[in-house]
Design a protein with these regions (language model features):
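Conserved AdoMet/S-adenosylmethionine-binding subsite of the radical SAM
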Residues: 1-114
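C-terminal accessory regions of radical SAM enzymes
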Residues: 84-87, 92-153
């Protein structure tokens, strides 16, 4: 079971995802499921440029995921914005982070993929810490046992 976590800090998680459970609630739920042997992990996406794409945030999410029993973390160090969703996102940016819309427009224009200037460094930090803590950066997929022909007698 995957849990989306993009902010280690509850105050920022509530700001970026109004109406969704705070990150600490997600980690508590993950820990409860992992303790029962359920395969759990984190989808750490999107990391919004200029908001939550910091080394401190990434490291804190990885450490909290480890503590909660996560088996894997799948990251995306940026955000994708299609036409239509971009306008909605920009309006939400202006409400939640006044002045940031102009920076997004200047940095990313109408690009679909919007990656912050430190995305490569964040990816390195993420992969090194996951390796150190023994957290996979890929998800194991369920593979059913191969079918066998039944005999009639």
């Amino acid at each position: 079971m995957s849990f989306t976590v993009t902010c280690a800090d509850d105050a920022l998680s509530v700001r970026t995802e109004p109406g969704a459970p705070a990150s600490s609630e997600r980690f508590r739920t993950m820990a409860a499921l992992a303790a029962k042997g359920i395969y759990t992990g984190v989808t750490m996406m999107p990391l919004l440029p200029l908001i939550n794409d910091t080394r401190e945030n990434v490291e804190a999410i990885v450490r909290r995921a480890k503590d909660a029993g996560a088996s894997y973390i799948l990251p995306m160090f940026g955000v994708t914005l299609r036409s239509g969703s971009r306008e909605h996102f920009h309006a939400a940016l202006e409400r939640g982070f006044p002045g940031l819309k102009a920076r997004y427009e200047a940095c990313f224009g109408n690009r679909y993929e919007c990656f912050g200037p430190n995305c490569r460094a964040l990816d390195d930090t993420f992969r090194n810490l996951c390796a150190k803590l023994g957290i996979a950066t890929r998800m194991e997929f369920y593979r059913p046992a191969s079918a066998q022909q039944q005999t009639l007698f």
